[in-house]
Amino acid sequence: MTSEVIEDEKQFYSKAKTYWKEVPATVDGMLGGYGHISSIDINSSRKFLQRFLREGQNKTGTSYALDCGAGIGRITKRLLLPLFGVVDMVDVTEDFLVKAKTYLGEEGKRVRNFFCCGLQDFSPEPQSYDVIWIQWVIGHLTDQHLAEFLRRCKRGLRPNGIIVIKDNMAQEGVILDDVDSSVCRALDVVHRIVRSAGLSLLAQERQENLPDEIYHVYSLALR
């Protein structure tokens, strides 16, 4: 549990905010120096997501998506805008959202809102989104705040909507990264938080073809 590794919650959040302010507003910056894996990541995410957009009667709509921890819009640009009519972005770092407006180019006109906010304080508009995409950011929330955020996301879904978490998973327990002030949780810990938020796991997939030295990355589709 994060309560065992985070001594000071306020400092946990403020330190992360300070860390990201110093990160370059580039794809490489967003990916911690692993910019070269961006295409591998996006292509796998697209395949994972499309199975829900293609199904019959209960298929997920393609009108509105929300990109959480969006940074400069790497995922918005390459995954969400090509598949959805309108995208909203939320990120704690204002400079990233400013950069997004040029990085996204012409298609960026279909980004409706740029919310500058930490996810612990963010509430998606109820019944507004077909897909809420949460990638490489859950480690910046405490267990309690993550569960509460997921509950708010659940309320933010349109009929047949889904939440996707894509993130690093530890082998066991919870590991604190003191550099960027984040945690990495084991898959079973994330499952427990997901259940506590009243969500069910629809699908789960491990990301392939990533460098050996980084954590295993999993995608979880939830409703």
Curated annotation (Swiss-Prot):
<keyword id="KW-0539">Nucleus</keyword>
<keyword id="KW-0808">Transferase</keyword>
<comment type="similarity">
    <text>Belongs to the methyltransferase superfamily. NTM1 family.</text>
</comment>
<dbReference type="GO" id="GO:0005634">
    <property type="term" value="C:nucleus"/>
</dbReference>
<feature type="binding site">
    <location>
        <position position="74"/>
    </location>
    <ligand>
        <name>S-adenosyl-L-methionine</name>
    </ligand>
</feature>
<keyword id="KW-0007">Acetylation</keyword>
<feature type="binding site">
    <location>
        <begin position="91"/>
        <end position="93"/>
    </location>
    <ligand>
        <name>S-adenosyl-L-methionine</name>
    </ligand>
</feature>
<dbReference type="GO" id="GO:0071885">
    <property type="term" value="F:N-terminal protein N-methyltransferase activity"/>
</dbReference>
<feature type="binding site">
    <location>
        <begin position="119"/>
        <end position="120"/>
    </location>
    <ligand>
        <name>S-adenosyl-L-methionine</name>
    </ligand>
</feature>
<dbReference type="GO" id="GO:0018016">
    <property type="term" value="P:N-terminal peptidyl-proline dimethylation"/>
</dbReference>
<dbReference type="InterPro" id="IPR029063">
    <property type="entry name" value="SAM-dependent_MTases_sf"/>
</dbReference>
<dbReference type="GO" id="GO:0008276">
    <property type="term" value="F:protein methyltransferase activity"/>
</dbReference>
<keyword id="KW-0489">Methyltransferase</keyword>
<dbReference type="InterPro" id="IPR008576">
    <property type="entry name" value="MeTrfase_NTM1"/>
</dbReference>
<dbReference type="GO" id="GO:0035572">
    <property type="term" value="P:N-terminal peptidyl-serine dimethylation"/>
</dbReference>
<protein>
    <recommendedName>
        <fullName>N-terminal Xaa-Pro-Lys N-methyltransferase 1</fullName>
        <ecNumber>2.1.1.244</ecNumber>
    </recommendedName>
</protein>
<dbReference type="GO" id="GO:0042054">
    <property type="term" value="F:histone methyltransferase activity"/>
</dbReference>
<feature type="binding site">
    <location>
        <position position="69"/>
    </location>
    <ligand>
        <name>S-adenosyl-L-methionine</name>
    </ligand>
</feature>
<feature type="binding site">
    <location>
        <position position="135"/>
    </location>
    <ligand>
        <name>S-adenosyl-L-methionine</name>
    </ligand>
</feature>
<dbReference type="Pfam" id="PF05891">
    <property type="entry name" value="Methyltransf_PK"/>
</dbReference>
<dbReference type="GO" id="GO:0005737">
    <property type="term" value="C:cytoplasm"/>
</dbReference>
<comment type="function">
    <text>Distributive alpha-N-methyltransferase that methylates the N-terminus of target proteins containing the N-terminal motif [Ala/Gly/Pro/Ser]-Pro-Lys when the initiator Met is cleaved. Specifically catalyzes mono-, di- or tri-methylation of the exposed alpha-amino group of the Ala, Gly or Ser residue in the [Ala/Gly/Ser]-Pro-Lys motif and mono- or di-methylation of Pro in the Pro-Pro-Lys motif. Some of the substrates may be primed by NTMT2-mediated monomethylation. Catalyzes the trimethylation of the N-terminal Gly in CENPA (after removal of Met-1).</text>
</comment>
<dbReference type="GO" id="GO:0018013">
    <property type="term" value="P:N-terminal peptidyl-glycine methylation"/>
</dbReference>
<dbReference type="GO" id="GO:0035573">
    <property type="term" value="P:N-terminal peptidyl-serine trimethylation"/>
</dbReference>
<feature type="modified residue" description="N-acetylmethionine">
    <location>
        <position position="1"/>
    </location>
</feature>
<dbReference type="GO" id="GO:0007051">
    <property type="term" value="P:spindle organization"/>
</dbReference>
<feature type="modified residue" description="N-acetylthreonine; in N-terminal Xaa-Pro-Lys N-methyltransferase 1, N-terminally processed">
    <location>
        <position position="2"/>
    </location>
</feature>
<keyword id="KW-0949">S-adenosyl-L-methionine</keyword>
<dbReference type="GO" id="GO:0007059">
    <property type="term" value="P:chromosome segregation"/>
</dbReference>
